Amino acid sequence: MIFFTLEHVLTHISLSIILIVITIFLMNLLVYEIEGLSYSSEKGMVASFLCITGLLVIRWIYSGHLPLSDLYESLMFLSWSFSIFYMIPYFRNKKSNLNVLTAPGTIFTQGFATSGVLREIHQSTILVPALQSQWLMMHVSMMVLSYAALLCGSLLSVALLVILFRKSSFTFSKYKGYYLPIGPLYFSEIQYVNEKKNIFLSFRNYHRYQLIQQLDCWSSRVISLGFLFLTIGILSGAVWANETWGSYWNWDPKETWAFITWTIFAIYLHTRTNKSLQSSNSAIVASIGFFIIWICYFGVNLLGIGLHSYGSFAIT
């Protein structure tokens, strides 16, 4: 009982902290930066990460297995994964601008996990025989980490497309590490200077060009990491399936959509490394992949069919 109470308390504390972090970030965008608030939001993300880590450890202790056996537990692990992708650059550079993606992702997944829709599967249960394997940790953790990385990378690509294809854009200025719009700018006003076969953007929109390049670079790195996790997850799942069901691949809904997801992001990496294609081409592919991931992740749980329907819930 005490473990369940601690888990409940930590869940609501982390949700409250994330809400405050998002509010602070929006305030910083509206009024540039309020002294001390940016520092508080960074510490808030760290505190939220520790809370989510604590509740996962508590659930692991009283359930006796890694909390990855149903939709509720995988959503909480996905929230933790979003926080991880914030923490890595933060501890490396003592600053991370990824909270614009990771904070909403954390609160969305954690909020859905703790909603009434999943109330019936909040309680930890004994694993079914098929899940009582050492492959559970490797396969499911790699898949959920890949979902978090690919979702973050895809959202960066969506942001890149918005900046590229808007007819009316804004001039961007760098202020304390953030790229902020300071005024309207139409593409017809952008001047290019061609000298010695090198193309330079006008100084007026130099930061916009920098932002596009950084978004392209960040999305490529994050998606590449997610693709690696996805590949490891699929391969470990195939080995696990062979041990459990006697076949490496069965083409059930989850496996089919995992293969589609892998194919989409393989195409992304191909277009990204092809120098004859523009960055917008790969960004479009990644944007499509964003929706494919959610179909792959929630599809089987909503339908409740196939070999991967453990922990699914019924819509009433």
Curated annotation (Swiss-Prot):
Single GO BP term: cytochrome complex assembly
Parts of the chain that traverse the membrane: 12-32, 44-64, 71-91, 98-118, 145-165, 222-242, 256-270, 283-303
Primary subcellular site in the record, as a coarse category: plastid
Cellular component, GO annotation: chloroplast thylakoid membrane; plasma membrane
Compartments, record wording: Plastid, Chloroplast thylakoid membrane
Keywords, ordered alphabetically: Chloroplast, Cytochrome c-type biogenesis, Membrane, Plastid, Thylakoid, Transmembrane, Transmembrane helix
Entries under InterPro entries matching the protein: Cyt_c_assembly, Cyt_c_biogenesis_CcsA, Cyt_c_biogenesis_CcsA/CcmC
GO MF annotations, alphabetized: heme binding
Topological type in the membrane: Multi-pass membrane protein
HAMAP family to which the protein is assigned, alphabetical: CytC_CcsA
Oligomer status and interactors: May interact with Ccs1.
Similarity comment text for this entry: Belongs to the CcmF/CycK/Ccl1/NrfE/CcsA family.
Cross-referenced PANTHER family: CYTOCHROME B_B6 PROTEIN-RELATED (PTHR30071:SF1), HEME EXPORTER PROTEIN C (PTHR30071)
Role of this protein: Required during biogenesis of c-type cytochromes (cytochrome c6 and cytochrome f) at the step of heme attachment.
Name of the protein in question: Cytochrome c biogenesis protein CcsA
Organism: Ranunculus macranthus
Taxonomic placement: Eukaryota, Viridiplantae, Streptophyta, Embryophyta, Tracheophyta
Gene: ccsA
